[in-house]
Amino acid sequence: MSHYAPSRELVVEVCRTLLDRGYLKATEGNVSVRVPGEDVYAVTPSSYDYSRMEAGDICVLGFDGRRILGQKKASIEASMHAAVYELRADVNVIIHTHQPYASALALMERPIPALFDEQVRYLGRSVELVPYAPSGTGFLKKNVAKRIGGGANAFILENHGVLVLGGSAEQAVHNMALLEKVALDYLLALLIDGRAEKVPLPIREIAFQKLRKDEKELAHQATAARAAREAAEARAREAERV
């Protein structure tokens, strides 16, 4: 069995969870998982029904775009996923969906301010807008890359959908559910009163610093995993020469 199998299986597991919760529909959206210690990731194929997806359907690509495994065409957003992994060592799972409430804000071109401490703790100081660009283009990839450096884990893609990041599959799914909950609450507040108050600044900063601490620990773990893998490969090469 290929050592990429666990990552491919995890992509399918995440897709099924999101499908069951109504965050994914038919072939919309995409999901990817970083392969530990490598510049490689597993990503959903393009235009393939999630209800029929199996591990063998998942594409395995290098960050440079080279195909490693999989016969199907990779998601048109694959390069966007690769860019996130290259820029954020703490991110191990990426989810892009067109889920209804958060996507409604994408159509309104409205970011979500810091409404709840839990939101800031896991998603960041705010859910920022990523300027519109056509799906699957280098323009969208560049727009996303410009936004993710601040440590936030959720973004609204103008006139498109949402992008959520996580250090694990469980955290990414949690972040997606939290984003949809916050988006619904925000929409209701705007509908009823036309406004929504932010959580107090000191609380926001405490919550955000906890998030940043988690991200630094994840980045450190990723660096250690890469170093261990490179050392193992070096030992293997040395053994071959002996």
How would you label these PLM feature ranges?
Residues M1-V242:
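Glycine-rich flexible loops
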